[in-house]
């Protein structure tokens, strides 16, 4: 009866948990904005890391004397081999720590080496990145160094004289104790005794004698199982230069992790959150090799503290928005560059531009504030009014209309341009939609895949509600002749300012051209006037000359009296 009741309770809990999961997923809503070719997925809750919790784990070692067992039994040989591996693991850790704390060494040298290695192994990709993107990439790698700063500080203190003995003394009668280190920091310490107890009480009494009383293979198997943790810890620290992430089950078993979470100075809601998401917690945790001495291996475990939980989070997806009515190769494109995760945080917004650094579990978003930017709440205006005057929205521009698709939480944005064929398909019905040129959106209702050219995208199958908000594509508001291209880290205001500069330059050019034309026209008028004046003067001179000539010809001839008398006499004489 009790068993039946227990099964019913478990079933009820499972059904309740399952229904809660479905309800949470159904609370996801997605808004697609046609005007900016972007989509916002809402309905998520935050789990933001705001601090670190450090603890020290110790593994007590055994003094293994040179065994005198001379048996040639196969079980004894296996035991000897396993003891040799045990000794080699301890020697490897001692060698790793012989100069200085591995964590301190890694913090000073390992991170630059990691960057150097990453540069070489990603040379092709790295060469394509712009200067600003290179700085962000390097900043992310260097962020590892700052992330482990608190753990490194504790690790360095453990090397001081007497610190390990202080921890050992505190753990004499208990497996856990809070120890105040010499730097004033109090840490929770714990010890692992399984291996030491087995070696001291079970194994060594059997092999450190002449008759080698190992009667069955179970002894060998049990030792191998218990020894495996030490071997794996040594391997992880050796391969990773003393710093490992994520936190493996060898560094901290699930029961040890849950116990440590329960001891953390956080609220019950935070403990519940971490306990129900141990895999995410492991991914965001570190283990730092510290010291091997006084028959103790000590290392620091650094766990995240999620100081901000249950505030709303949303994810912005963006895709290129291009003109489609111009000739091929003459279109212009605009893309929002503010994609990533956003979470409300104490009256402002924490923005995580590298969305992949956040881990999503159901509707919970686990992010590290070390990777965030703090923005005002006005940043939300970019979704509904990208031209708003309160917040300058971030964009990039280009003149390359490349087709692509962006998979969202419950759908897909499709940017389809040129002669590329873009379709949405159902696995049973085949192609159910063909996209025309431009930016479009499709929800996952009845859609399994999206195809853009030869690239196939699988949509997510989460439950949710999609909203299609229509609007004139903002790229159509811009003149291709003055649109600035290849602005990779710009904003609406900066792009508009460059356009205004271009327009002002064109206006100034027109004015100069007009002034030149006016000058030419004035010169022509003056020359014409002078010519006319000259012609008029010449005509006037000609007229005066003619008038004088005519006047001269029309004057009568006056004869003297003598001449007149002569004429008369001649007449009478005849």
From Swiss-Prot:
InterPro entries: Fusion_F0_Paramyxovir
Highest taxon of the lineage: Viruses
Cytoplasmic side stretches: 551-574
Positions of the UniProt region annotated as Fusion peptide: 137-157
Lipid attachment, kind S-palmitoyl cysteine: 550
Keyword Glycoprotein: yes
Site positions for Cleavage: 109-110, 136-137
A Pfam family annotated for this UniProt entry: Fusion_gly
Segments on the Extracellular face: 26-524
Gene Ontology BP term (one): symbiont-mediated induction of syncytium formation
Gene Ontology CC terms: host cell Golgi membrane; host cell plasma membrane; membrane; viral envelope; virion membrane
Record key words, sorted: Cleavage on pair of basic residues, Coiled coil, Disulfide bond, Fusion of virus membrane with host cell membrane, Fusion of virus membrane with host membrane, Glycoprotein, Host cell membrane, Host Golgi apparatus, Host membrane, Host-virus interaction, Lipoprotein, Membrane, Palmitate, Signal, Syncytium formation induced by viral infection, Transmembrane, Transmembrane helix, Viral attachment to host cell, Viral attachment to host entry receptor, Viral envelope protein, Viral penetration into host cytoplasm, Virion, Virus entry into host cell
Signal peptide: 1-25
Coiled coil: 76-96, 158-209, 481-516
Glycan-linked positions: 27, 120, 500
Disulfide bridge positions per record: 37-439, 69-212, 313-343, 322-333, 358-367, 382-393, 416-422
TM spans (from-to): 525-550
Similarity comment: family membership: Belongs to the paramyxoviruses fusion glycoprotein family.
Protein name: Fusion glycoprotein F0
Organism (species): Bovine respiratory syncytial virus (strain Copenhagen)
Gene: F
